[in-house]
């Protein structure tokens, strides 16, 4: 039964639910077959049984099926076009895997062959409960569908099996066409053709609303989908809800951009629409031009992809290492601010932070400009949200790679099964019921169980005579696990389990029974239990843990965003003591403080302030370092007579000292990012050697720069991405060094005519930079400008800066009779 111009591999549609079907089988049972003609039984003669014989050459059609010609082309209003069929079809029968779920061709049903010459198919009768029975009667291969007469002697009707099959086929074909059209917004009536014309797909324009609806429903765009001007990506409104609540003929398949612009952003904060509009989006025009420059400057496709991915990543919040959850708070803050300006419809060029779906869309739009083959698929390796999206780029004719836009911008990954599997190509109809999600209980009993076994085993270890560390062997076993099994548990949020959690039950029982027989080796009550963090970090037992009583605090010599700095005497030596302003730390914060102290303890470099120890007991948490007599570089540069005291060569040497110290920090494993590099955090000794300090405390800083009460926390030295509260890396320190070099070259205070809020607006959001004097050494000016590049990845490293400064220092001639006072 082939239909010209249409596919023939559609499955039959099942109308009735499973509990309406009763099967009586003799011999080898065929599975259920659901009839679709129960509502039309009144159209046939009651009490007569219509018969059709299946011969090898074809069928003898029932007269009610119409006259001659192709039976499938008969125009019968009681088949496909009748409203009774549409009304009787529940949406709950739909499935994403095929046109309709539970098809009569799915499962184990074996359809009788049409070429069986001797099979006689009798008509179907319907009892009052709309059920029917299948049975084998007689001998041989005869399949008889027994008719159940009406118990009241009423009328019964019958249709041949072929008519029912044809009716099912036509109805399901119509529904499949409708659902596919709704899901894909296909304007081409031949979109079901197996081999589409690629040239036609490239040249046929699609309206912005059509492509927007396709992406809204499917979350995917193919290589041949060009994102037109006026395209908008909606979020916060479910397509299924929209389809149920509105009239498609009046309101359209997707909310129009005009109706979205009329929505008050305060009514529904979750609704957003990111629009691609080249005419009214100047920031996007700038991106358009930059993409052309990238395309012209790069030789290979891989270089283009790499540069384009880094451009998008840096523009939309930078890379994140631990997952996209780091971007969510910044994204909410960004979109809330933009909604106050643009309401619900936000231009894509105005986004300073973007999630994976925004980055994928921008990559697709810019890739289309330079004809880079790119498609958007559902799913992301950095998040598990339903609206997650990723970009894949095609290399040649048979290779495609996933472009990383979140964690490692520009890196090419092999696409996994989630992106190339059935979910990426299946039609997702808005008429389909949303897939229910499992409801998580309010109490996670698995975590409670882990905590229970962890607590129980900790008791075993504390009172275990074999434990020669009196209660701390548990922690060493946890953190020194060579197998890495506990690390996987910790990543899942469940914490680390003690090794005994993996014991067989009998071993666990034996360990618990030892509590009664074990001697009590716990320390006496009067003896303080050693601090777990101190033991873990190695601070106890050496001179790094300084008792507060050993310090003789003297005059105050400075203040910072973390506290006050005092000169003190410790065992006859001058030291600097930085007393932390925030002393009310929780145990977790104290441990974090101790970890930072441990990092500082391991640093040894002539341009790093020497760490001497720490006071680790609240309320006197303090950092003890070497004392540098000349104070901060900021004070030295901005006092009277600085130009006479600090000649050009000395100032360049000071810049070189800062670069050496920062290069040492950035080349540590793992790298140490200062995050608060500025002239007040640079100290000068009596020989004018500059040393970096305060690099280990930036992670403890809970307040923002605007809440700081001293000049040490002002944003004059901060990089634009830091001012925008975006993720940053070591290149933010390079920007800060550029401000310090400008400070050394001009002996001026950066942004002295602006308050902190104005600096944030000028540098972070208006891309303003300090003015470089025209009479400044061009080579020094070039270094400063390189450090101030808006894209962090374009800024030089400190090793490169050292190479650039070294010849400048040699060429600068010191003035005669200079003395290092």
UniProtKB/Swiss-Prot annotation:
<keyword id="KW-0936">Ethylene signaling pathway</keyword>
<keyword id="KW-0808">Transferase</keyword>
<dbReference type="GO" id="GO:0010182">
    <property type="term" value="P:sugar mediated signaling pathway"/>
</dbReference>
<feature type="domain" description="Protein kinase">
    <location>
        <begin position="551"/>
        <end position="809"/>
    </location>
</feature>
<dbReference type="InterPro" id="IPR000719">
    <property type="entry name" value="Prot_kinase_dom"/>
</dbReference>
<dbReference type="GO" id="GO:0001666">
    <property type="term" value="P:response to hypoxia"/>
</dbReference>
<comment type="similarity">
    <text>Belongs to the protein kinase superfamily. TKL Ser/Thr protein kinase family. RAF subfamily.</text>
</comment>
<keyword id="KW-0723">Serine/threonine-protein kinase</keyword>
<keyword id="KW-0418">Kinase</keyword>
<dbReference type="GO" id="GO:0010105">
    <property type="term" value="P:negative regulation of ethylene-activated signaling pathway"/>
</dbReference>
<comment type="subunit">
    <text>Interacts with EIN2 (via C-terminus).</text>
</comment>
<protein>
    <recommendedName>
        <fullName>Serine/threonine-protein kinase CTR1</fullName>
        <ecNumber>2.7.11.1</ecNumber>
    </recommendedName>
</protein>
<dbReference type="GO" id="GO:0004674">
    <property type="term" value="F:protein serine/threonine kinase activity"/>
</dbReference>
<feature type="compositionally biased region" description="Low complexity">
    <location>
        <begin position="14"/>
        <end position="25"/>
    </location>
</feature>
<feature type="region of interest" description="Disordered">
    <location>
        <begin position="481"/>
        <end position="502"/>
    </location>
</feature>
<dbReference type="InterPro" id="IPR055164">
    <property type="entry name" value="EDR1/CTR1/ARMC3-like_pept-like"/>
</dbReference>
<dbReference type="InterPro" id="IPR011009">
    <property type="entry name" value="Kinase-like_dom_sf"/>
</dbReference>
<keyword id="KW-0067">ATP-binding</keyword>
<dbReference type="InterPro" id="IPR051681">
    <property type="entry name" value="Ser/Thr_Kinases-Pseudokinases"/>
</dbReference>
<dbReference type="InterPro" id="IPR001245">
    <property type="entry name" value="Ser-Thr/Tyr_kinase_cat_dom"/>
</dbReference>
<dbReference type="GO" id="GO:2000035">
    <property type="term" value="P:regulation of stem cell division"/>
</dbReference>
<dbReference type="GO" id="GO:0005789">
    <property type="term" value="C:endoplasmic reticulum membrane"/>
</dbReference>
<dbReference type="GO" id="GO:0009686">
    <property type="term" value="P:gibberellin biosynthetic process"/>
</dbReference>
<dbReference type="GO" id="GO:0004712">
    <property type="term" value="F:protein serine/threonine/tyrosine kinase activity"/>
</dbReference>
<dbReference type="GO" id="GO:0106310">
    <property type="term" value="F:protein serine kinase activity"/>
</dbReference>
<feature type="region of interest" description="Disordered">
    <location>
        <begin position="1"/>
        <end position="76"/>
    </location>
</feature>
<feature type="active site" description="Proton acceptor">
    <location>
        <position position="676"/>
    </location>
</feature>
<dbReference type="GO" id="GO:0046777">
    <property type="term" value="P:protein autophosphorylation"/>
</dbReference>
<keyword id="KW-0547">Nucleotide-binding</keyword>
<dbReference type="GO" id="GO:0009750">
    <property type="term" value="P:response to fructose"/>
</dbReference>
<dbReference type="Pfam" id="PF14381">
    <property type="entry name" value="EDR1_CTR1_ARMC3_pept"/>
</dbReference>
<feature type="binding site">
    <location>
        <position position="578"/>
    </location>
    <ligand>
        <name>ATP</name>
    </ligand>
</feature>
<dbReference type="GO" id="GO:0005524">
    <property type="term" value="F:ATP binding"/>
</dbReference>
<dbReference type="GO" id="GO:0009744">
    <property type="term" value="P:response to sucrose"/>
</dbReference>
<dbReference type="InterPro" id="IPR008271">
    <property type="entry name" value="Ser/Thr_kinase_AS"/>
</dbReference>
<feature type="binding site">
    <location>
        <begin position="557"/>
        <end position="565"/>
    </location>
    <ligand>
        <name>ATP</name>
    </ligand>
</feature>
<dbReference type="Pfam" id="PF07714">
    <property type="entry name" value="PK_Tyr_Ser-Thr"/>
</dbReference>
<dbReference type="GO" id="GO:0009873">
    <property type="term" value="P:ethylene-activated signaling pathway"/>
</dbReference>
<comment type="function">
    <text>Acts as a negative regulator in the ethylene response pathway. Phosphorylates the cytosolic C-terminal domain of EIN2, preventing the signaling in the absence of ethylene. Interacts with C24:1-ceramide upon hypoxic conditions (e.g. submergences) to in turn regulate EIN2 endoplasmic reticulum (ER)-to-nucleus translocation and EIN3 stabilization.</text>
</comment>
<dbReference type="GO" id="GO:0009723">
    <property type="term" value="P:response to ethylene"/>
</dbReference>
<dbReference type="GO" id="GO:0048510">
    <property type="term" value="P:regulation of timing of transition from vegetative to reproductive phase"/>
</dbReference>
<dbReference type="InterPro" id="IPR017441">
    <property type="entry name" value="Protein_kinase_ATP_BS"/>
</dbReference>
